[in-house]
A protein has these predicted regions:
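N-terminal auxiliary segments of SAM/dcSAM-dependent transferases
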Residues: 1-17
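Class I SAM-dependent methyltransferase Rossmann-like catalytic core
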Residues: 19-59
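Conserved SAM-binding loop of SAM-dependent methyltransferases across substrates and taxa
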Residues: 75-92
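Conserved SAM/SAH-binding beta-strand->alpha-helix loop
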Residues: 104
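S-adenosyl-L-methionine
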Residues: 109-148
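A short SAM/SAH-binding and catalytic strip from SAM-dependent methyltransferases
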Residues: 150-166
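Conserved beta-strand signature within the Rossmann-like core of class I S-adenosyl-L-methionine
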Residues: 181-192
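Class I S-adenosyl-L-methionine
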Residues: 197-246
Length: 246
């Protein structure tokens, strides 16, 4: 009975939110998303950040002063993964500016809550700038007005598949990114499937980066909640990853 009920609830969630492609507007949907997908998306982003930042040709000045731009941040999964990497790597952090871009005001509020709790617990100086809008609604100076001269880390976590659906203009967005004279790093990750891959290919074509750290597909171990068994379990998950410096 519980398994049947769980299947019905998951099916209703997927139908109501277009498999979470629509901005989440209900508290229960935010919770369902995190339960179903949150941990796996966190692990994918942590994998790419952890891998790239130990590469010998990747350098970041300490104490760290940086700006993190989380595109389609949802509930802040990618930002939390980035912060956790810095903490667990025992890197000195002077100041982090987080620009959260998310059309759902409810998800954005939840992201701010989790990030501020993390910052307080770790005693990190973090400034959060929340932009409740779509990518196409961003002001041309959304970066210049927020980032000072900090290196910028642009995080695309499970979002590039929406490019294929025509939900936003990746060409326009990358032009805004490239206008900034700062150091710009891109970290993008998603489950490996065809529509998502088109977004990754377009991102590479539009940005024409100077340095490519990663641009590949692969498989990683992720822990996921399985509604059929009502518990978490490990599985091999296909991923598409992209990391570059413009």
């Amino acid at each position: 009975m519980l398994v049947t009920l769980a299947k019905v609830e998951v099916s209703a969630f997927c139908n109501r939110t277009a498999r979470a492609k629509n901005p989440l507007q209900q508290f229960d949907d935010l919770t369902s998303y995190m339960a179903l997908y949150g941990l796996a998306h966190y692990q994918r982003m942590r994998t790419i950040i952890d891998y790239v930042q130990v590469m010998p040709h990747f350098k970041i000045t300490q104490p760290i002063e940086a700006c993190v731009i989380d595109y389609g941040c949802g509930q802040g999964i990618a930002s939390l993964a980035f912060i956790d990497h810095l903490i667990e790597s025992k890197l000195q952090i002077k100041c982090l500016k987080l620009v959260l871009i998310e059309p759902s005001a409810h998800a954005l509020k939840r992201a701010i809550y989790w990030i501020e709790k993390k910052a307080k617990a770790a005693e990190i100086n973090i400034e959060v700038i929340a932009l409740a809008c779509t990518f196409d609604e961003l002001e041309p100076d959304y970066l210049a007005s927020n980032i000072n001269q900090y290196p910028c880390f642009h995080l695309f976590n499970n979002i590039l598949d929406m490019y294929s659906a025509g939900i936003f203009s990746l060409s326009k967005l990358t032009q805004l990114i490239k206008m900034q004279p700062n150091e710009n790093f891109i970290f993008a990750v998603s489950p490996d499937f065809s529509s998502g891959n088109r977004g990754f290919d377009a991102l590479h074509e539009f940005t024409r980066p100077n340095t490519i750290y990663l641009n590949t597909t692969g498989t990683i171990e992720v822990e996921e909640y399985r509604y059929t068994s009502q518990k978490t379990s490990m599985r091999k998950a296909p991923v598409r990853v992209y990391a570059a410096k413009l």
